[in-house]
A protein has these predicted regions:
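Surface-exposed binding/hinge segments that line
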Residues: 129, 147-211
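Long beta-strand-rich cores associated with HINT superfamily self-processing modules
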Residues: 447, 568-595
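Ligand/substrate-recognition segments at binding pockets and active sites
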Residues: 17, 241, 398-404, 408-482, ...
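N-terminal lobe/hinge region of extracytoplasmic solute-binding protein
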Residues: 52-101, 229-230
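Append "and occasionally in soluble cytosolic enzymes with long acidic Gly/Pro-rich linkers
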Residues: 343-444, 547, 593-594
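Gly/Pro-rich hinge or "lid" segments in bacterial periplasmic/extracellular proteins
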Residues: 85-86, 187-188, 195-264, 272-273
């Protein structure tokens, strides 16, 4: 759900007079542990795995997709050097067979699989294909993830006088056809995990002409909507906007050939339609929307060493008892406030009124954890216990409380009252009954604090577009990890990246010009200045992460609401692996079978 800018963030800060950097940063070095994914075998059981995609898709281009709905499909068609197997957070090699890392953590040399074919007649994957694909990520006007390669991982490159990336200068070298050497500006604690993200996937060199030096072998819109070419276990079949998408088994896949013949996603955003589709057995593996979910029907039979719960659920409406999986994935769902359009007292009043625990229990039926930080508990500095302790002791708007009197007082102090009410609009994404209920509860509470809050809904893709254009006041969104460390989340609260007047901001809050915003910007610079996978750098990062959380508390830019427990249900004919903390959107289906 983030966006890109082709301007280096460091250069942007210099150009705009950003806060001076200090010395602090961190991350989860454990996230760089890897294993090797074995290829060969597979294929056979056939049939179509029928799924539900609960959001509108926007594109099939890996560097342009910023929404989970598109990402679910892209994950099946495009392979990268690394991968999160079944959404676990220990990365594996994928198109790489192994790698070497320099002692100073700045040079990575990857050995590629030989003979790994692209779909169609585009030959095998080579190092030159990765150079081309990563140049697109950095330089293409279609890229919304340029900051991943230019800033987050920080591959060496040159910039022009305005701080923009100078095309063709990435320090990515093809030593030979099957050896790729990558040089970073400085060490980064999550290099291997970020390379598992599909924005770094391989495309055939020259397939598109959206960067310098290439005319392209097909039109961009054809690739992005009708004929995406990758090296994944499935190849594209169809995508009908707001209807369905389908991929089919790629028989020459370099890894384990898919068991199923095809995977089909019906695109449905409405909760009632989702549940009806699943109850009619049109979906094999599916979510159950909260309005139709009964926690008393869950029977947990096993909890593994990663805390994943498995068992059964039912009976459901059609009389069946289905399989159950519940995983505390790494995510955060929140209300974002455009600070240019919603005054601070109103934002604070919303925080006073919001009782996150009440929302989880009464609206979400216990399917998650109340959120008081944007950083999820399982990657918060010090872990879940530290998360809870910091929130209990320091959250300024009432931990597990609704404080209407304080909400009313902050608005009266700002000059509002019964005859002078403040008004703003909260936009939620269409089809979400739970967000609609949350919005209604907040609206009713704020009515007692001299605030008239309007509620509107918009399709997910429309909400994102309006956000990028700065045309939202308050909005509901969520963020699911790209790599398992706090900086992947807190980049959304880095003030320079929230400016909607810039090219594709990462969030839509326009946070600047306040003491808290300045502290957050300074803290994020400290994070950037301490990127190494060392204990010292991690301690520095951890300090800055907490500073950013507290700065957000002060200005209420994001109002955290909940951390979701991802649950999936499936009929007895499906044999599917458990997904991990990276979530089901990172799971590949080539090992899934239909009986």
């Amino acid at each position: 759900m983030s966006e890109k800018s082709n301007m280096s963030r460091r250069s942007f800060l210099k150009a705009t007079g950003g806060a001076a950097s200090a010395s602090v940063i961190a991350g989860t070095a454990a996230g760089q542990e890897t294993t090797t994914q074995q290829g060969g075998g597979g294929g056979g059981s056939g049939g179509t795995l029928n799924l539900i995609n609960t959001g509108t898709m926007s594109t099939l281009d890996p560097i342009k997709a910023t929404d989970t709905a598109s990402g679910r499909v892209i994950q099946q068609m495009f392979d990268a050097l690394m991968n999160y197997p079944d959404g676990a957070i220990e990365v594996q090699t994928q198109l790489a067979t192994g790698y070497e890392r320099s002692d100073d953590f700045t040079t990575y040399t990857f050995n590629l699989k030989e003979g790994a074919p692209f779909h169609g007649d585009f030959g095998e994957v080579t190092a030159q294909d990765f150079i081309y694909s990563w140049e697109r990520l950095a330089a293409s006007d279609n890229s919304r993830r340029a900051y991943f390669i230019l800033d987050s991982i920080g591959i060496q490159h040159e910039t022009d006088s305005e701080g923009n990336y100078k095309p063709g200068t990435l320090a990515v070298e093809a030593v030979d056809d099957y050896t790729l050497r990558v040089t970073l500006e400085e060490p980064f604690h999550a290099t291997l995990p970020i390379l598992a993200y599909t924005s770094f996937a391989a495309l055939p060199e020259g397939i598109l002409g959206d960067i310098q030096g290439y005319d392209g072998e097909m039109e961009y819109q054809t690739f992005a909507t009708q004929n995406p070419i990758g090296a994944g276990p499935f190849q594209f079949e169809t995508w009908q906007s707001n209807d369905e998408a389908e991929v089919s088994r790629f028989p020459n896949y370099h890894g384990e050939t898919a068991q199923v013949e095809a995977v089909n996603w019906r695109i449905i955003e409405d909760d009632n339609a989702i549940y009806t589709y699943a109850m009619n057995r049109n979906a094999d593996y599916f979510p159950i929307p909260t309005p139709f979910y009964d926690p008393n029907k869950v029977s947990v039979e096993n909890t593994d060493d990663k805390g994943r719960e498995t068992g059964t659920y039912g009976p459901v409406r059609n009389g069946a008892t289905v399989n159950y999986l519940g995983v505390a994935t790494i995510n955060a769902f929140y209300i974002g406030f455009n600070t240019n359009r919603v005054e601070k007292p109103a934002r604070q009043a919303a925080a006073y009124a919001m009782n996150q625990q009440q929302v989880i229990e009464q609206i979400f039926k216990g399917r998650g954890q109340a959120a008081y930080h944007f950083t999820p508990p399982n990657i918060y500095p010090g872990g879940p216990d530290a998360y809870t302790q910091h929130a209990e002791q320091n959250y300024p708007y009432g931990y597990n409380q609704t404080q209407i009197q304080q909400a009313r007082q902050v608005m009266e102090d700002a000059g509002y009252g019964p005859n002078n009410q403040y008004e703003f609009t909260f936009t939620i994404y269409s089809g979400s009954d739970t967000w609609n209920q949350t919005a209604q509860l907040l609206r009713d509470q704020l009515a007692s604090a001299h605030i008239s809050m309007n509620i509107e809904s918009a399709p997910f893709s429309t909400l994102l577009q309006r956000g990028r254009e700065g045309n939202l006041q308050a909005y509901s969104l969520g963020w699911v990890m790209d790599w398992p460390a706090p900086d992947n989340f807190l980049q959304l609260l880095n003030p320079p990246q929230t400016d909607t007047s810039q090219d594709a901001p990462i969030s839509y809050v326009n946070w600047s010009g306040t003491p808290a915003a300045n502290r957050a910007a300074s803290a994020y610079e400290q994070i950037e200045d301490n990127p190494a996978p060392t204990d010292e750098a991690e301690a520095a990062r951890n300090e800055s992460y907490v500073q950013m959380e507290e700065a957000n508390w002060e200005d209420v830019v994001f109002l955290p609401v909940y951390h979701e427990t991802d649950e999936r249900f499936w009929y007895q004919n499906v044999d599917i692996s458990k997904f991990g903390a990276a979530g089901p959107s990172r799971q590949m289906y080539n090992t899934t079978s239909i009986n």
